Design a protein with these regions (language model features):
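Membrane-proximal helix-turn-helix segments that form the acceptor-binding/catalytic region
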Residues: 87-90, 113, 137-155
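An aromatic- and histidine-rich active-site surface loop
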Residues: 76-90, 94-127
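Nucleotide-sugar donor phosphate/pyrophosphate-binding loop at the beta->alpha transition
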Residues: 117, 127-147, 187-189
């Protein structure tokens, strides 16, 4: 019988729909668990947006969840949780450690030091975002990017632009794997009609966010 691949995952807040990374991790890990992988997600401590009853969920769709110590202060939550997740994954019995985002990748050298195979998924050039553009946060995230280049066995990027950036900046080969989407279930917009009195084909609905 073939032995299961043991995989540790961190970088997400928790398995929820709080953000893009969380959705990617949830969808990816759920499918990998269905395909026979043994997966542990190291989640950040703190309140789950879906309600307090979800804060300490141990298992989700075949995925083992563990909460790591977290300093719940602005600017420290992601750093502290990523550090402890890196330690846990380094000392745990895992074949692969999959790290999501540039900031958490700062600590990718820790599991690598303990002989783990490390994969880093770069969801975007976070250091260039407006909220991180200046100061310590930007420098930390940028160093995380450099550590991924230096220590990760494989790097996954989600866009051709970021793939080109890594090649031109670091001469580093990456794997371009864009995010997939679930086929939508088409439903009648009855709630919109009931609430706003708008009929089908009489309006345009735009959903988006500012980053």
């Amino acid at each position: 019988m073939e032995e299961k691949i043991r995989l540790a995952v961190f970088g997400q807040k928790r398995l929820s729909r709080e953000g893009g990374i969380e959705i990617v991790v949830k969808e990816l890990c759920t499918r990998m668990a269905q395909n026979g992988c043994d997966i542990t997600c190291y989640n950040r401590a703190g309140h789950h947006v879906s309600g307090a009853e979800y804060d300490k969920t141990i298992e989700y769709d075949g995925i083992r969840q563990k909460v790591v110590p977290t300093i719940e202060k602005k600017g420290l939550a992601a750093v502290s949780s990523s550090f402890f997740a890196a330690l846990c994954s380094a000392f745990g019995r895992y074949d692969v450690v999959h790290i999501h985002a540039e900031g958490p990748a700062f600590f990718c050298w820790i599991p690598k030091l303990f002989g783990k195979r490390v994969i880093s998924t770069i969801h975007g050039l976070d250091w260039a975002r407006e909220k991180w553009k200046f100061g310590v946060g930007s420098k930390f995230i940028r160093q995380g990017e450099k550590n991924a280049v230096k220590y990760a066995d494989e790097i996954i990027v989600l866009s051709k632009g970021v793939q080109k950036y890594f090649m031109e900046t670091y001469g580093r080969e990456t794997h371009f794997i864009p995010n997939g989407v679930n086929r939508p279930e088409v439903r009648e917009a009855k709630l919109i009609t009931d609430h706003f009195g708008l009929e089908k084909d009489s309006y345009i609905l735009f959903l988006g966010r500012l980053v």
